[in-house]
Amino acid sequence: VKTEFSDGKGAFQVEGVAGNRYLLSVAAVGFGRYWTSVFETPATGVALPVIQLAPHQTAQLKEVLVEGRKPPYEHYPDRTVVNVADSPLSAGATTLEVLGRSPGVTTDASDNLSLRGRQGVLVFIDGKRVPLTGNELADYLRALPADQVQSLALITSPPASYDAQGVAGVIAISLKKDQRLGTNGSINGSYGRGEFGKFTGGLSLNHRRKNLNIYGNYAYTDRQGFTRLDFQRYFLATPQLPAASSVQYNDQRTHLRSHTGKVGLDLTLNKRTLLGASVSGLASRNLTETQSNAQFQENASQLATFYTSLAAQDIKRPNSSANLNLRHAFADSASAASLTLDADYARYHTTRLLGLYTYYNAPFRPTNLLSGDQRSNLDIGALKADFSQPLPHRARLEAGAKVTRVTATNDVAFANTVDGMTTTDQNISSQFQYYENVNAAYVNLVGTWAGTKLQAGLRAEQTNTRAETADSTSREWHYLKLFPSLLLQRTLSKAHTLTLLVARRIERPAYGQINPLRAYFDATSYQAGNPELVAATSYNFELSHTYKQKFSTALAYARTDQPIVNVVQPSPDGGRVVVNRNVNLATQHFYTLTLTAPLELTKWWTLYANGLFYYNRYAGTLAGTSLDRGGFATNLTLNNSFVLPGDWVAEVNAFYESREVFQFQVIQPRGQVTVGVQKSLLGKQASLRLNVSDVFYTVPTHVTSTYDNFTEAYFRRDDTRVITASFTYRFGNGKVAAARKRAAGAEEELRRAASQ
């Protein structure tokens, strides 16, 4: 029914098992297993007498090897956990690709992540918030190899100990950590081939003694690929310009190289106090070359205009972070109060160089070179304290506070070269600065009484932001908001459990969404932030039923005021250039039904099925276009796991996304099938994995956006069908020790929430 671990003195506590008859089994390495007689657990709980284990009589115990394989997916009332490390499908993949195959996770044409059909997702990596959105976040996750990831937690209703940011929820990414005693490590390498090659290699080392643990890891990625983009655009007539249309074909080559690393130590100062420190970094360089061929037709009576553009971009992103944390228990027992302190600093730097050549077929339109040099820095500092106090009757009170400060600077210079003459383009060259301070405090009560589990919390966040441009234009926001959260779970019988989830959350505009400076894709398309964006707030409600602790049915509703959405519109500069940016609409109403079924079809075949059926309705106005429409959509995920003879493991993953009406867009259906096998070698110290992603090449993106003044049909295909081979070798001591949790930023609160 349940498994728990004792503390250092052998004390343990098992929650959520009231009102039934049980047997208790106790085991420890070097001792014989102990079984109690049958006993009942009343609503008030039961205290067992002292249990003594008898040592084994074996004169010498050489080695005990404990083997186990986690299921690919684990479902809980407020989250789904994706166990990435043991999956043959993760070999050679990126973290973004693994997310795209996870139940309920999708990406749109602009690389915005959605969780259960809703945008506005907050991403953590080892407890550190990633302050990026859109294609910047997608590029970051592309640069992070999936071989370094242990698990993903898709949390739709986080407790009060989490930041309130993210109206759709939280994606918590946990990286691998070695828990073995002594000196241990692993080496891995993979090579994949689609139309272009993809290489990943890595090394991890860990030295653990009684009071000290030193660890480090490094990974290098070299991935080449392509993207094909086709656009059909229709511009309606305005008082300034006649109606027009264009057809554009883009062929893009990409070359991404990244270095990922982390070093740290955990030090046991005494039996109650643990100190940890770590430094990590992810440095990437992405080279892209894009050739665009386009045809413009102003109206039927004029000749068409043709142009070809060549765009070369060199984007460098050296990112680094540091963490110092301390955990102290105020007594030696498992019921002692504890305090965790964290200090974090992170720096995200971006250099973006652009060279955009445009050649026209018209003699009166000379060749033009647009060159750009954009440099940005994002500095984040955070201090955090979490206190936990166990209470009588198996309850616990938690409280904490957090202070975060963000400083962002951006400087971009564009120059035009025509007929050999170069001039600075002052209209699109500028500087931008952004400051943000969030002060937060929370209280959370957790307890189980007579078959009812309660988790009730309240979080307060006070936000102060200021945005400044080069012309001294400044905007400030100051506000205080409260964010209640509730998890109420009632065990009706051995087979039936009901859970109610309620939460209020916020979506503050990210720095990149406010930054008005431009990033050009080609001669007719650029991306820019919107300084007029305001924060969105959401009220989320969910009622779920679980049958036999496996089969889950959930009904949910969410209302979001002033939701932030991504749109494509003609540039305010005029002409036939379009801008990709974010705007606020009035409201979003979201209704969803989620069905989850983990099925053990045979001893060697396990099927995890997840069905998401939802209705999404938006209301608002943009560029004279009134919007009040919605549509039904479906997202299906099937994952088959096979444990085969001869130490073989196989997986087949398939997902399907139906046609969807989303904001101003109509998104066509798509799907993907990925297969993989894994073989253990060298006495299970090594493994060989082989997988093929997007077997049937069925995951293109086809979107039509319709406004009163503009229509765009968009088609995108990437280098997604890839065959990959991977080899991993593990060396060192096989004995496992209890790992010290490296609490970085919010990592301790993530761990604590996941155990509830």
Descriptions of predicted regions:
Residues 371, 380-384, 423-430, 534, ...:
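Outer membrane beta-barrel strand-and-loop segments of large Gram-negative receptors
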Residues 47-52, 95-98, 137-140, 154, ...:
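N-terminal periplasmic accessory domains that precede
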Residues 25-31, 45-89, 108-110, 116-120, ...:
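Short, acidic, small-residue-rich periplasmic hinge/interaction motif at the N-terminus
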Residues 96-133:
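Extracytoplasmic beta-strand/coil segments of soluble accessory domains associated
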Residues 1-11:
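Short, acidic Ser/Thr/Gly-rich low-complexity loop/linker segments typical of extracellular
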Residues 464-465, 494-540, 555-575, 695-708:
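Surface-exposed extracellular loop regions of Gram-negative outer-membrane beta-barrel proteins
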Residues 260-284, 309-468, 550-554, 589-614, ...:
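Face-selective signature of the C-terminal outer-membrane beta-barrel domain
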